[in-house]
């Protein structure tokens, strides 16, 4: 139970001491409990920001944050509670996550350090609508904090001479296969179908998976996963009938492999060379376009 030192959310700053979290008193010494005080600032739009100072016991912090969040969200009718802490504070991070807060992002180099350098700060939150506890609540919290990778789905279309379809884009010098970045919660194959429709105006029945490639960090991008799907046979007449998305695609062409080597990045060409050489029932896994 949390004591209500201020009964109105609009009151601004309402200090909440950890000793009011009565269910923890039988697990931790009174001295440990009274050493932690949370400062809680509430905005006029129903958002509370929780902070504390100095190193704290992680188990105590978890319980205090959980109790404070439940009091603010359920007891006082707020809609959002926020916590910020240095990205290097792993113990605090675990406590915040275990208290049901979800990682929303990182504010880069905003915390001034004694040596004159700056550190990143992680932003965590709990909403009144968040499910907390149980399998779903645990998974949702962990999903917010675990690594995520970009997923790219491209399509390999060829003609009877084994020339491949490549696209010249509006945003970079090298060419690429039709396709693009898969949206969140979108299956990779359907992402490829959508991208081809958007870029080329083509409703394509995408076939089997040919290549899965891990791409290392490159030109400011983090690492990513690329999938290449079979797109079937096309002709020059097919290309002439496509409706190119003018903001993304300058041109498309059927090119042989020697020409492709001059248009693609070395990584993309390694991947393409492997894909076109696969047998009818073969699939390849590569790292940086190379078989491990």
Predicted regions: what they are:
Residues 31-40, 140-164, 181, 212:
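Conserved N-terminal beta-strand and adjoining loop/helix that marks the start
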Residues 2, 82, 173-174, 246-292:
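Nudix hydrolase/Nudix homology domain
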Residues 77-78, 85-94, 159-198:
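Conserved Nudix-box catalytic region and its N-terminal flanking loop in Nudix hydrolases
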Residues 84, 102-117:
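Conserved catalytic-core motifs of GNAT/GCN5-like acyltransferases
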Residues 58-74, 94, 98, 188-193:
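Conserved acetyl-CoA-binding loop-helix of GNAT-fold acetyltransferases
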Residues 117, 121-154:
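Acidic, metal-coordinating catalytic segment for phosphate/diphosphate chemistry
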Residues 38-56, 65-66, 175-180:
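Conserved acetyl-CoA binding element of GNAT-fold acetyltransferases
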Residues 135, 182-205, 213-268:
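Unchanged
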């Amino acid at each position: 139970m949390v004591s209500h030192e201020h009964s109105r959310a609009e009151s601004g700053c309402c200090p909440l001491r950890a000793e009011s979290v009565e269910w923890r008193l039988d697990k931790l010494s009174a001295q440990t409990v009274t050493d932690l005080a949370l400062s809680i600032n509430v905005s006029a739009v129903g958002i509370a920001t929780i902070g504390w100072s100095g190193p704290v016991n992680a188990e105590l912090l978890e319980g205090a944050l959980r109790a404070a969040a439940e009091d603010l969200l359920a007891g006082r009718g707020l809609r959002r509670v926020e916590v910020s802490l240095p990205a290097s504070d792993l113990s605090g991070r675990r406590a915040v996550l275990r208290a049901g807060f979800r990682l929303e992002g990182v504010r880069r180099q905003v915390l001034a350090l004694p040596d004159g350098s700056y550190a990143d700060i992680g932003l965590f939150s709990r909403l009144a609508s968040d499910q907390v506890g149980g399998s779903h609540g645990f998974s949702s919290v962990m999903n917010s904090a675990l690594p995520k990778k970009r997923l790219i789905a491209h399509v390999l279309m060829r003609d009877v001479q084994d020339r491949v379809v490549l696209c010249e884009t509006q945003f970079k010098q090298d060419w690429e296969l039709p396709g693009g970045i898969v949206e969140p919660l979108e299956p990779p194959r359907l992402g490829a179908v959508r991208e081809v429709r958007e870029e080329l105006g083509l409703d394509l029945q995408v076939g089997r998976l040919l290549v899965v490639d891990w791409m290392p960090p490159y030109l400011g991008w983090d690492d990513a996963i690329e999938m290449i799907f079979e797109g079937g046979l096309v002709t020059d007449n097919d290309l002439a009938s496509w409706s190119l998305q003018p903001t993304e695609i300058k041109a498309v062409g059927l090119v042989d492999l020697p020409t492709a080597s001059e248009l693609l990045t070395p990584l993309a060409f390694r991947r393409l060379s492997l894909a076109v050489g696969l047998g009818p029932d073969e699939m390849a896994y590569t790292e940086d376009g190379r078989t491990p």
